[in-house]
């Protein structure tokens, strides 16, 4: 297991802030404790879930290896996060269909992953050389999925996408 993320690692918390910061306006629109969230692919240390709980979001966690609780996949959520996990999906269309069920109407799907910029740069891209990275997405891919499945999409950082379900 190569995961080195921990609750005490301020650098990791700052890294996750790239997802948390653009979610803050959405969180502030709701009463403290009323939002329900799911950290999908939380890993062994669900730091983002903890950070969201500090903001008043009631969080559940799911990870096929570290938090394999299928019952949390049977409800819908105001916020679903998927940080540094989607690139590991061997059948991303399956998880995407699940995301469409998990995100409540008006809810937000927040994804963090490096995006493909163009074919030429992909050839020399270090990110694809990680053998566990098997799925890659571009801005155009997320725009297509958003249009097809009823989301408004924004790109608040080079590796963050927010999709708000209409």
Question: Which residues make up each language-model segment?
Answer:
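Short glycine-/acidic-enriched loop or helix-start segments at secondary-structure transitions
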Residues: 48-49, 91-92, 120-122
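Conserved N-terminal segment of class I S-adenosyl-L-methionine
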Residues: 1-79, 96-97, 129-130, 140, ...
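Short phosphate-binding/catalytic loops that engage adenosine nucleotides
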Residues: 56-57, 107, 151
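A short SAM/SAH-binding and catalytic strip from SAM-dependent methyltransferases
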Residues: 80-92
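Short, glycine-/aromatic-enriched active-site segment of Class I SAM-dependent methyltransferases
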Residues: 112-135, 140-141, 145
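Active-site micro-motifs of SAM-dependent methyltransferase domains
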Residues: 66, 87, 116
